[in-house]
């Protein structure tokens, strides 16, 4: 099984901070690849002034084109919107049976994990690599056996 990290986000736009975190997690964990999963619509975030979906996707592709350990994944462009992590990961498992997927998120996102669709199935079925955001606490799940806190540089 190829261990692949899924780094979800709006990437509005993708920036050096995203790339540093993705590269760091790839380099200092057991992940063989990190996929940047561009989310057209996050169900837990208000509608902000987002760049067009295709623009965000293209910028992400350009940002990682010279880094073979990072790949852009556009699966959520082909799924019903809004996109839910559980639906995306189940589809990816169906499409890529030779991979073990790990969910990458920041403590700013993970603090609301209890609001995610089917969070119980996610926490019991998948590993989470959570990178520390100094101003946010990982919440009640920080000590869960499925959660690994990563001290990534910011």
Label every PLM stretch briefly:
Residues 1-154:
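Nucleotidyltransferase catalytic core that binds NTPs
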